[in-house]
């Protein structure tokens, strides 16, 4: 047993006698099963993107990076559970930092990937075109930056930002972490959350504004249509799903960590239930593949085809009409009367903003 870890756990009230915690509890087994599901679904998403040449585009690379980070979250959370309980006191401080730091890296990479997707979608809406050509290097540089920042963020405690020499500043949730570090991470994640909310709100506002302008133009030409408002409502539903899921999974953990910083040692009993809040954040890694990939008709079709035949998927050349509430087609609402060529300022390129990707076909 490592005396330093035991002292910190005892000081924060988390110390457990080894003989009282001999093995996995029922909730830990449930968490591991959920992690296995997370790993499986994200592996399938990665295989779908890898096997489908149509998905070898910047936006799908971001989706793939999100799946990779979520897959890693499932793996490291499983390892975290197996190394917890009585096994905690068998770890050296460095091993403990790697156990917890790997969780921070995986979850940070997942959150940063969500931000990267929101930024890419927003840029696409501003420029009204996709970055399909000549931008692969930029995309991979951005993905590399995501992982670099996540690794630095997760590695700060093992580099020295910890409370080994100042026990009074120790976190209750993570007894070797300094409260200042917990506050820093919570602030970073909260800023990212706000940025994602703002970006999706702007995406909706941009689409809504352009749809209204086109409706007014059509009404003036005697060609009124309610398709634009229907598509705007579809996008609004999608944005609400994306943001609600993200906030519901992450906000409780953010609040708990803020309580951890504010509370004195042994005063907040809710801090000893942190595993449930962390599990909820990890659950977001199970929801992301459903929200960001399977709501796309093309990805869902490729996904199912791969499961059925296990061979390289070759989707059809054209994207089908998106389902209501899952995808939003700007040009289909903006150009529903496209055969009439009296609106030259709008490109014939079709841009689909799904709940997790933006694709185009010409």
UniProtKB/Swiss-Prot annotation:
Q: Which residue windows are transmembrane per the record?
A: 26-47, 62-83, 96-117, 140-161, 176-203, 239-259, 271-291
- Which pairs of Cys residues are joined through disulfide bonds in the record? 163-170, 263-268
Which organism is this entry from?
A: Danio rerio
Q: Which family does it belong to?
A: Belongs to the G-protein coupled receptor 1 family.
InterPro entries (UniProt xref)? EDG1, GPCR_Rhodpsn, GPCR_Rhodpsn_7TM, S1P_rcpt
Extract the GO molecular function terms from the UniProt entry.
lysophosphatidic acid receptor activity; sphingosine-1-phosphate receptor activity
Topology relative to the membrane, per the entry? Answer: Multi-pass membrane protein
Q: What subcellular locations does the record give?
A: Cell membrane
List of residues binding sphing-4-enine 1-phosphate: 99-100, 246-250
Q: Where is the composition biased (Basic and acidic residues)?
A: 329-348
Q: Where is this region: Disordered?
A: 328-362
Comp. bias (Polar residues): 352-362
Function according to Swiss-Prot or TrEMBL: G-protein coupled receptor for the bioactive lysosphingolipid sphingosine 1-phosphate (S1P) that seems to be coupled to the G(i) subclass of heteromeric G proteins. Signaling leads to the activation of RAC1, SRC, PTK2/FAK1 and MAP kinases. Plays an important role in cell migration, probably via its role in the reorganization of the actin cytoskeleton and the formation of lamellipodia in response to stimuli that increase the activity of the sphingosine kinase SPHK1. Required for normal chemotaxis toward sphingosine 1-phosphate.
Q: Which Pfam families match?
A: 7tm_1
The entry annotates sugar attachment on: 10, 169
Q: Write the record's keywords in alphabetical order, separated by commas.
A: Cell membrane, Chemotaxis, Disulfide bond, G-protein coupled receptor, Glycoprotein, Lipoprotein, Membrane, Palmitate, Phosphoprotein, Receptor, Transducer, Transmembrane, Transmembrane helix
Provide the GO biological process annotations: adenylate cyclase-activating G protein-coupled receptor signaling pathway; angiogenesis; cell migration involved in gastrulation; chemotaxis; G protein-coupled receptor signaling pathway; heart development; mesodermal cell migration; negative regulation of angiogenesis
**Quick one: which gene encodes this?**
s1pr1
Major site of localization recorded for this protein: membrane
Q: What is this protein called?
A: Sphingosine 1-phosphate receptor 1
**Side Cytoplasmic, residues:** 48-61, 118-139, 204-238, 292-362
The GO cellular component terms are: cytoplasm; membrane; plasma membrane
Q: Which residues lie on this side of the membrane: Extracellular?
A: 1-25, 84-95, 162-175, 260-270
Q: Which residues form a coiled coil?
A: none
Query: Which residue(s) hold a covalent lipid per the annotation (S-palmitoyl cysteine)?
Result: 309
């Amino acid at each position: 047993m490592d005396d330093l870890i035991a002292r910190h756990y005892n000081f924060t009230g988390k110390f457990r006698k080894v003989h009282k915690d001999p093995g996995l509890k029922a909730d830990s087994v449930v968490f591991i099963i959920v992690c296995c599901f997370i790993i499986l679904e994200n592996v399938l998403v990665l295989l779908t993107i890898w096997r489908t040449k149509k998905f070898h585009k910047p936006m799908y690379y971001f989706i793939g990076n999100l799946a990779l980070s979520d897959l890693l979250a499932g793996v490291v959370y499983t390892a975290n559970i197996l190394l917890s309980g009585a096994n905690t006191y068998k770890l050296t401080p460095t091993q403990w930092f790697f156990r917890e730091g790997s969780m921070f890296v995986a979850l940070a990479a997942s959150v940063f990937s969500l931000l990267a997707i929101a930024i890419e979608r927003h840029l696409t809406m501003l420029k009204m075109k996709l970055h399909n050509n000549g931008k692969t290097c930029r995309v991979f540089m951005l993905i590399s930056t995501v992982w670099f920042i996540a690794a630095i963020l997760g590695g700060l405690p093992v580099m020295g930002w910890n409370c080994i020499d100042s026990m009074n500043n120790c976190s209750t949730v993570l007894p070797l972490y300094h409260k200042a570090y917990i506050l820093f991470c919570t602030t970073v994640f909260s800023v990212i959350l706000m940025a994602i909310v703002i970006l999706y709100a702007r995406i909706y506002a941009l689409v809504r504004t352009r749809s209204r302008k086109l409706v007014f133009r059509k009404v003036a030409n005697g060609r009124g249509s309610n398709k634009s408002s229907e598509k705007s409502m579809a996008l609004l539903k999608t944005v609400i799903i994306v943001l609600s899921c993200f906030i519901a999974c992450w906000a409780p953990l953010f609040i708990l960590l803020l309580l951890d910083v504010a509370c004195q040692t042994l005063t907040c009993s809710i801090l000893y239930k942190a595993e449930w809040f962390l599990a909820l954040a990890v659950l977001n890694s199970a929801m992301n593949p459903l929200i960001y990939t399977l709501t796309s008709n093309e990805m869902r079709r490729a996904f199912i085809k791969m499961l059925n035949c296990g061979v390289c998927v070759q989707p059809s050349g054209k994207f089908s009409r998106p389902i209501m509430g899952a995808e939003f087609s700007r040009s289909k609402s903006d150009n529903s009367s496209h055969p009439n060529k009296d609106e030259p300022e709008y490109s014939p390129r079709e841009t689909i903003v799904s709940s997790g990707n933006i694709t185009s076909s010409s």
